[in-house]
Amino acid sequence: MSFRTEPPYIHGSTPKTAVVLVNLGTPDAPTTSAVRRYLKQFLSDPRVVEIPRAIWWFILHLVILPFRSGQSAKKYASIWSNEGSPLKVHTEKQAKLLNGYLGERGHKVKVVYAMRYGQPALPDVLRQLKADGCERILFLPAYPQYSGTTTASIFDAVFSHYTQERNVPELRFIKHYHDHDAYIRALRKSVQAHWDMAGRPDKLVMSFHGVPKRTLTLGDPYHCECHKTARLLAKELELTQEQYMVTFQSRFGKAEWLQPYTAPTLQKLAKEGIGRVDVICPGFTSDCLETLEEIAMEARHDFMSAGGKDFNYIGCLNEDDAWIKAMAEITELHLIGWPTIVPPSLREEQEQQAHISREEARRLGADQ
């Protein structure tokens, strides 16, 4: 086992705390080559595709990447903004706003963001945090509902990174927040704001990203957490069971995934005479390809072409103030016990003690 070279140890330094907001990732550009690189990394993760590696290698490299990369690039191009990928833009802004809000609340922490796939790569961000002297790191996945296909993959990447480090920092992980009051309230405010302007629909469809059905039978709690989020949001909105429903989108491959599927369900609703539907994607905290293209464009077409009259997509929480405050509340809960809020008098004392420690180390022969 070989380890990476560590930065020089600095005696008397004050340990720093960091929060890493981690999202799924995105291609660097809406081009076939960039999308191919991204898909290769994403679909090579055994957490994402549970097929024997040898078999999957041939499927991925001989079928999926040659044909799907170009198709996906066109879809990315349809939602790409002047700032870049919407998912990356929103995640970066969320991290900056969370950093500022925690600072206003007195926390001395550094908030950064990383992507599980693509850039900024999680290992690169972790190396920079080490160089910055961060010895306590809290990981905040951008996924409210836990899944082995998403959240656990972040944990895997973090653990893998630190197997090659000698000096490992204190690590904490937020597993999920699907039923956190602040998250549910932020969703309610988002929906209610839309309804205050446009009125209520005949049906509110809550569309979550799908996963293979077998993951449910094998013990993944994702399905249950999605339904709990939906139930709590419906309660906040005072909806009856007939006024909302849960669906699952983004099916990939031929295997059975969690049902009902979003697109066929919308078509069915239109044919049954449901004139207006509003669709929200509570599992996505930043708008991205799956919301802006798959739902706002494709799902709209499916519903309207089947006879629907009015389709509204309610955007993700993105930089909504209620969501930033919710993120802060969730983060603060998991920062308990770490000295991120230090009174000025105590901070001065800590600096004095650090100076004494540093001078004593130098007296004994330390370089730094």
UniProtKB/Swiss-Prot annotation:
Record has Calcium as a keyword: no
Record keyword Metal-binding present: yes
Catalyzed reactions per annotation: heme b + 2 H(+) = protoporphyrin IX + Fe(2+)
Keywords recorded for this protein, A-Z: Cytoplasm, Heme biosynthesis, Iron, Lyase, Metal-binding, Porphyrin biosynthesis
Annotated positions binding Fe cation: 209, 290
Alphabetized Pfam families for the sequence: Ferrochelatase (PF00762)
PROSITE patterns: FERROCHELATASE (PS00534)
GO cellular component: cytoplasm
Cell compartments where the protein resides: Cytoplasm
Tree of life domain: Bacteria
Any GO BP annotation: heme biosynthetic process
Signal peptide span: none
Entry GO MF terms: ferrochelatase activity; metal ion binding
SUPFAM superfamilies: Chelatase
Region described as Disordered: spans on this chain: 347-368
Record InterPro entries: Ferrochelatase, Ferrochelatase_AS, Ferrochelatase_C, Ferrochelatase_N
Enzyme class at the top of the EC tree: lyase
Function per UniProt: Catalyzes the ferrous insertion into protoporphyrin IX.
Protein family: Belongs to the ferrochelatase family.
Name of this protein: Ferrochelatase
Lineage: Bacteria, Pseudomonadati, Pseudomonadota, Betaproteobacteria, Burkholderiales
